[in-house]
Amino acid sequence: YALWITPLRALAVEIQQATQRMNDALLPATKVALRTGDTSQNLRAKQKRDPSFGLVTTPESLHVLLSAKEHQTYFKQLRVVVIDEWHELLGTKRGVQVELALAYLRSFISKLRVWGISATLGNQELARTILLGATENYSVINAKISKNIRVKSVLPKTMERFPWRGHLGLHLLPQVLILIEKHKSTLVFTNTRAKCELWFHSLLE
């Protein structure tokens, strides 16, 4: 049983779909579930009765699971926890939530393996210590990939009626879509978590 924790609901959806596709190819009988604030009560009850091979969730939803009466039974088969985008959580209240959850899980799961994933960590040693604690039993894997990166800023054709409030920037959606469709891999940067969620849903639609 594996648990994947991600800071964004939008990212959780993408990860669940990607891991399920991989499982369909390698382990067709296994399922990867999704648990966020948007998950219905019926689906939550089903997940509790019949846990999947893997669960993708957020720090807040993990704490909801840990507050359930029979949570130790639910997590007794847990072997691996993956913390995605650790740099986003590190040093924040939500990061502390993750640290507390991991400490508690370790108290009744003796051989729990924890993975931290990040593409932009400045101080790897500090990030590792906060995530794993004082242990010498760890490995660091660094990817050495050389890529040709092109950065393009998308600006409105006119600034006369620029919407500084509300759905800031969404009027540029058609231009951004053209760029995404032209390339195999595209990163869209937003300033806040809320904007990331907004753009994710808008691009899907």
Give the label of every model feature segment.
Residues 24-28, 46-50, 71-76, 95, ...:
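Conserved catalytic network of the ASCE P-loop NTPase/AAA+ motor domain
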Residues 60-63, 69-109, 113-114:
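SF2 helicase catalytic motif II
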Residues 1, 31, 51-54, 60, ...:
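Loop/turn-to-beta-strand initiation segments
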Residues 26-33, 193-205:
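Conserved C-terminal RecA-like helicase domain
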Residues 14-22, 61, 65, 77, ...:
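Alpha-helical scaffold elements adjacent to nucleotide-binding pockets in ATP/GTP-utilizing enzyme cores
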Residues 1-57, 61:
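Conserved nucleic-acid-binding Ia/Ib motif block in the N-terminal RecA-like helicase ATPase lobe
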Residues 10-11, 61-64, 88-89, 123, ...:
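Residues immediately C-terminal
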